[in-house]
UniProtKB/Swiss-Prot annotation:
Ranges for region Disordered: 230-258
Pfam families referenced in this protein's UniProt entry, alphabetically: Ribosomal_L3
TM ranges: none
Function noted in UniProt: One of the primary rRNA binding proteins, it binds directly near the 3'-end of the 23S rRNA, where it nucleates assembly of the 50S subunit.
Protein's name in the database: Large ribosomal subunit protein uL3
InterPro entries reported in the protein's UniProt record: L3_arc_euk, Ribosomal_L3_dom_3_arc_sf, Ribosomal_uL3, Ribosomal_uL3_arc, Ribosomal_uL3_CS, Transl_B-barrel_sf
Taxonomy of the source species: Archaea, Thermoproteota, Thermoprotei, Thermoproteales, Thermoproteaceae
Entry annotated with the keyword Translocase: no
Family: Belongs to the universal ribosomal protein uL3 family.
Molecular function in Gene Ontology: RNA binding; rRNA binding; structural constituent of ribosome
GO CC, one annotated term: cytosolic large ribosomal subunit
Amino acid sequence: MGLKINRPRRGSMGVYPRKRAADIVPRVRTWPEVNLGKPALLGFAAYKAGMLHAVVVDDRPTSPLYGKEVVKAVTVLDAPPLYVWGFRLYTLDPTNGYKRAVAEVWASELPKFLHRVLTLPEKLDVDKQLKKVEEFRDVAVDVRALVATQPHLSGIGKKTPELLEIPIGGVPSVDERINFAISLLGKTVSPKDVFTPGQLVDVIAVTKGKGYQGVIKRFGVTILPRWHKHRKGHRRTGTIGPQAPAVMFTQPRPGQMGFHQRTEYNKRLLKIGENGAEITPKSGFPHYGVVKGPYILIQGSVPGARKRLVVLRHPVRPPRKAPPAAEPQVVWVSSQTL
C-alpha cells in the first residue's frame, strides 16, 4: 500500500461549456412556487452599484453574537421601479406537455422610452386582446408579466431599457393571477411590492469578464517546478490527455474566463430603502454614479460588474433553517465603498 493521494480534478464540469453568456440580461430558467397569500411578481431586476459595509444587529438566536452589533459587507443594488407594459398567458401544449403562449396583452398607452426597444403598432386594440384572455382563462396554467427596466431613473446614464418576463405567483389560483396582471397594466412595481426585508433571495447575473486566460488562472492548475527538466513550460498542464481520443474536453485548457451567467442561492436581503442619498458616498459610487431612488441592500457579494443588471427571485431551494423573518436592524451604513 502506497501513499494515498487525494487530488480532485481541476475545475467543475457542472458549468461547461465555459463560454461567454448569450445575453448580458440574465435568463431565468426556473421559478419557485411560493405561497404569499396574495398575487405578486416572483422576481425583480436592479442594477449593481457597488459595495459598502454596514453595522447590523445579529438576530440569529443560535449565534454567540446574538443581539450584538456586527459588521457585514453589503452590496447596493439600484432598484428603480419596473414598468409593466403587458402580460402573457400560457397553457400546456397537448402534443408535448410544454407551456405555450396563447394570449398577450399590452398596455394601451406606452411611455416614450419603450420605443427604443419595441416597435409599437399604430392601432392597439386592448379589448380584442382581453377577449382572447377570457377565451383561454379556464385552460391557462401560467401568467407572466412583461416588464421593462427604467435606467433613466438610475445612476447609469443610459436610456435604453431591458425587457424581462417575470411570472406572477403567490397564490395557487390562476384566475387571481390573471386579474392581478390586468390591474398592473401600465403601472410600475417597486421592490417593496415583491420582497420583504430579512428574506432570502436568489441572485442571477452575468459575471465579470476576464477574457482569454491560461489554465493556471482558469482552473487553478499547479505551477510546475522551474528547473531544466520542465523546459516546455511551467504555467501549463503536464499532459493534455492520451494519444486517442484526440481531444479530452475534461482536461484543463486555456480559453474564455468570466462573463458567464451564474446563480447564487439564498442571499439575505437586509434592507429596502426609498432614498438612495442615504447610502451614496459623497463622490458617488466609483464607476457607477449616484443612486437616486429606491435601493436594495444584499448581504455579501453579488456576481457581475458595476452597472450590470441583476435579477432577484424568491428562493427555489430555501434552507431548512431559514433566518428570522423579522426585518434586520441595520444600525449604520458606511459612506465609503469597498
